[in-house]
Amino acid sequence: MASLSFTQFLSFPRCNADVPCLLQSHGFVKFRGERWNGKQSFSMAAGRRKLSESAPLEEEGNDGNGAVVGKKPSKSVKRTTKKKVVVKDEPLEEISEFLVDNDDVLDKESIVSALKPKKTRTRKKAAAASSDVEEVKTEKKVRRKRTVKKDKDVEDDLATIMDAEVSDVEEALAVESTDTESEEEEIDLSKHEGEDISHTYGWPPLVCCFGSAQHAFVPSGRPANRLLDYELHERMRDAKWAPEKYIRAPGGCAGGVAIALASLGGKVAFMGKLGADDYGQAMLYYLNVCKVQTRSVKIDGKRVTACSTMKISKRGRLKSTCIKPCAEDSLSKSEINVDVLKEAKMFYFSTHSLLDKKMMSTTIQAIKISKQLGNVIFYDLNLPLPLWHSSEETKSFIQEVWNLADVIEITKQELEFLCGIEPTEEFDTENNDISKFVHYPPETVEQLWHENLKVLFVTNGTSKIHYYTKEHNGAVSGMEDVPITPFTRDMSASGDGIVAGLIRMLTVQPDLMNNKGYLERTARYAIECGIIDQWLLAQTRGYPPKDDMEEEEDDEEEDEVESDPNGIRSITEKEYRTSKPYDEPDGPYVMKPVEEREYKKLELVGSMFEDGSL
């Protein structure tokens, strides 16, 4: 009988394993949605007759103690069966109400009922060692507490699952609601207060460039007119490279403006996030080499730098993939360096930092902190026009940051796009008349004005810069560079230089921001910075070779004229300056080599005083 009792006990633990043959023999009732120990749990509805048959088995297996131990477990089992019989005798309507109205109670009872057969078996095994009934009762109490804890864990898991299944629309609404709440509440900067160290800031004032540091590839905008000195181009026609169309494209990102401003002698700090990969490390190194402060730069080890990869498929087609989300768009609000914003006098940002939802909320938070600290907000629109469908869509997207800006810089094409103006310019003409670059009246720009705006700059490369204030408006004409190389066709080389020149002048004299004379000087300085930027780009990337050099190259050597992988041939600045034009061997504007130059000694022409003293 001992062996029989063992085989009988062996069939009960298999209720946790989903065995279909045992479900019919023991009459299990399955509750949907309940799990225990990673498997589906069952509650057993057995009759008194089957439970009474299991009672003698206990008495035989207890060796003398069966009279005592066999009765008490049978009583407890009878109590459980009485409860189950009552549930079975209830009408169907009451049971349905019980299931609908008391789901939580049913879940707990189902779990407890699934545990009760386990308790009887554990008591049978424990009875072979000791016949103490009180220990069994304490075990029951402890297990009941554990079931309550596990119920709470299940509820927590369900809550986390429900939170994870929130749709994108609800998330966007939540972001908007938090943004509206943050607008109403002022930012508390008391936790960032400390000792006043403003006397250690030095000169010139610090400028914080907020955004991404990356090599931006932007689509071309539209053909653009250029203001040229055609006489100078005719004298130096070897330096003139005339492509079919000149294109105005948006400038670079915040990292490019920071580097351009540092090259002008300004003090600038870059605030953003970089990836922990080779691209991010190279960009961080380049910022440090260019003397840009990187104390507010965060390194993200989980996300990589944004880049696009292209590969050839099996059918010979090109497939491109873009890394998203990237490290540049993952800067959180808690990672904003308030100490840098305290020291800075101007906060610069562009539309690049508004394209991602999380990055947009971080940008708005940084703008509000800067406004609260008294900084000047400089907004560089940098809007790739082919990426936008209408001006209404663009206005609704940039409306919030537009109203927070003190100084805004946009291009002439962006102004016409936002105001819905159709350009009346004549392209590809040699007419340098003032009507070639129209200066729109203040009434046209009035629809873009708001109460916080102090200055609005409208740039057209280095050809012309327009400025608008509440009291004054005007324009300053410039000139495009003479040596246009094959690498400056999009005319965006001077974009960062122009913005850096404007920032440099406005940070030095912020009190003269509404002075018409100072604004004209600022625009002229920005034009010069843009021209120098184009010259430096030409110096770095090379000049187009001359016709005679190409002929000599075909006959003798091909090492003098370098060519890039795209087949564009260029020469260095030294070769361009020292070589003579093929049609003007002794021209007056040719720069001779150093060893052939002649220097004349200057003689004193006259004196300021009669005695001959200077």
Curated annotation (Swiss-Prot):
Homology family: Belongs to the carbohydrate kinase PfkB family.
Protein name: Fructokinase-like 2, chloroplastic
Start-end of Acidic residues biased regions: 548-563
GO molecular function: kinase activity
Annotated region (Disordered), positions in chain: 47-75, 542-592
Cellular localization per UniProt: Plastid, Chloroplast
Taxonomic superkingdom: Eukaryota
GO cellular component: chloroplast nucleoid; plastid-encoded plastid RNA polymerase complex
GO biological process: chloroplast organization; etioplast organization; plastid transcription; regulation of DNA-templated transcription
Transit peptide region: 1-44
Summary of the knockout phenotype: Plants display chlorosis prior to leaf expansion, but exhibit slow greening, remain autotrophic, can grow to maturity, and set viable seed. Albino phenotype of seedlings grown on sucrose-free medium associated with reduced plastid-encoded RNA polymerase (PEP)-dependent gene expression and altered chloroplast development. Delayed greening of seedlings grown on sucrose-containing medium.
Alphabetical keyword list: Chloroplast, Kinase, Plastid, Transcription, Transcription regulation, Transferase, Transit peptide
Quaternary context: Interacts with CITRX/TRXz. Binds to FLN1 and PTAC5. Associates with the plastid-encoded RNA polymerase (PEP) complex.
Cystine bridges: none
Gene name tied to this protein: FLN2
Biased composition (Basic and acidic residues): 571-583
Function comment: Required for proper chloroplast development, most likely through regulating plastid-encoded polymerase (PEP) dependent chloroplast transcription. Acts as a component of the transcriptionally active plastid chromosome that is required for plastid gene expression.
Note, other: RNAi plants display abnormal plastids lacking internal membrane structures.
InterPro entries: PfkB_Carbo_kinase, PfkB_dom, Ribokinase-like
Pfam families assigned: PfkB
